[in-house]
Amino acid sequence: MKITNPVLKGFNPDPSICRAGEDYYMAVSTFEWFPGVQIYHSKDLIHWRLAARPLQKTSQLDMKGNPDSGGVWAPCLSYADGQFWLIYSDIKVVDGPFKDGHNYLVTADAVDGEWSDPVRLNSSGFDPSLFHDPSGKKYVLNMLWDHREKHHSFAGIALQEYSVSEKKLVGERKVIFKGTPIKLTEAPHLYYINDVYYLLTAEGGTRYEHAATIARSSRIDGPYEVHPDNPILTAFHAPSHPLQKCGHASIVQTHTNEWYLAHLTGRPIHSSKESIFQQRGWCPLGRETAIQKLEWKDGWPYVVGGKEGLLEVEAPAMSVKEFSPTYHIVDEFKDSSLNRHFQTLRIPFTDQIGSVTENPHHLRLYGQESLTSKFTQAFVARRWQSFYFEAETAVSFFPKNFQQAAGLVNYYNTENWTALQVTYDDALGRILELSVCENLAFSQPLIKKIIIPDEIPYVYLKVTVQRETYTYSYSFDQQEWEKIDVPLESTHLSDDFIRGGGFFTGAFVGMQCQDTSGERLPADFKYFRYEETTE
């Protein structure tokens, strides 16, 4: 059997992999999307299912007002002492000389069980991880952020002991690794293998220069010797390789005594409008997760098949275990809670923004703030996970003024999105409006307004994504569809387009209701269909 990469498609970056018996788990970053952290489960490293979203409460994660691409960065999941340990950052500032953020620890007996309230650890840098030393001690590592003028912001990897009984860091903080000439050293994971400490880090930034570096030492606090063929993982030297941005990795030893590395990757698409300065492409699916096999030579791990990684990887020698789908193609909102694959922005899904029970078999969203808000949006969405798909919904919405709108949205962040919405025109009544926001440049490109007949209870909305472009359509009866002849660029919903590539999520599609008049006018969505297609 083969592992086919990426194993986690769509926005699923910064994988932290661990094993509990014969079960395998990966935690990935969620940034400003709520609930915080996604944990996937596998029995064979081939098939993965979304098993849990552990940070469900605002006592664990309060992101209201967080910036775009703030929130949960680089969680680290581990299993020790009969329980799961999850450590994560909540980043409050992403621009400028400071990187304000706080690092927390939560625990649970099972990944899909109740997670504890958080222990606040420190705020000295991001990408924290927890290491369980064979001595019984526990240590927290994180990159150290230095805001000072004439100092490099990435000041190295810091190590400090954590007291389980006192629930706090104790002893001296020590920088144990300053990184390599690749620079931008972050994402530390520490392993103890055959009496040697191995420190795995990410370097080079999280764009196309991304890489994974490994170093080793006989002592936990160093000094650390760098791998003789470092970096052990990168695709920067191979611009035509289908897996790009390879880096930010973690390691697991299987119960069959094989070694694998989970890592971040991106799959770029190219556009006819591409300039000579953008030769690497765009990744609208965001940063995804792939798995590579490792082999050991002279006490060092190497990626089998080359340091850029493979699309198909030899699977471990264990029984294959497939899972039933956790997301149905059509969701008719028959359950008492949202499907796990849906998320909201910054805040939990509560009756402040919506309900799946108030109008049976509907998702009701109460009009809140606009798509540019970092506070209270009524927006329920899921990831783009394919370059070719359709998403469709039906909305019942009767606005009374132009500040009320509801519909289908494709979204990257508050500065980059498109929306086909039912809204109101003073002269025409209910209409459909297409809105486009690209790096905060706002436009409404429809020349002729689409009038909705008074007797129509539901307006059907659809988006068709075909690799580098996507288009909206609408119908008043779900039979006859009218395509809106405004092709939109998928590349504009990618890390690589957003203000020059400084952000970290991926494209989402979903349902939204806004009422900037403050009346909270509700919209009822009858279903949501997400279906992957072929070229």
Curated annotation (Swiss-Prot):
One of its GO terms (molecular function) is xylan 1,4-beta-xylosidase activity. Pfam families: GH43_C2 (PF17851), Glyco_hydro_43 (PF04616). It catalyses: Hydrolysis of (1->4)-beta-D-xylans, to remove successive D-xylose residues from the non-reducing termini. The active site is at 14 (proton acceptor), 186 (proton donor). InterPro entries: ConA-like_dom_sf, GH43_C2, Glyco_hydro_43, Glyco_hydro_beta-prop_sf, Glycosyl_Hydrlase_43. GO terms for biological process: xylan catabolic process. Keywords: Carbohydrate metabolism, Glycosidase, Hydrolase, Polysaccharide degradation, Xylan degradation. Coiled coil: none annotated. The record marks 127 as: Important for catalytic activity, responsible for pKa modulation of the active site Glu and correct orientation of both the proton donor and substrate. Its EC number is 3.2.1.37. Beta-xylosidase is an intracellular xylan-degrading enzyme. Belongs to the glycosyl hydrolase 43 family. PANTHER family: BETA-XYLOSIDASE, BETA-XYLOSIDASE-RELATED. Oligomer; homotetramer or homotrimer. This is Beta-xylosidase.
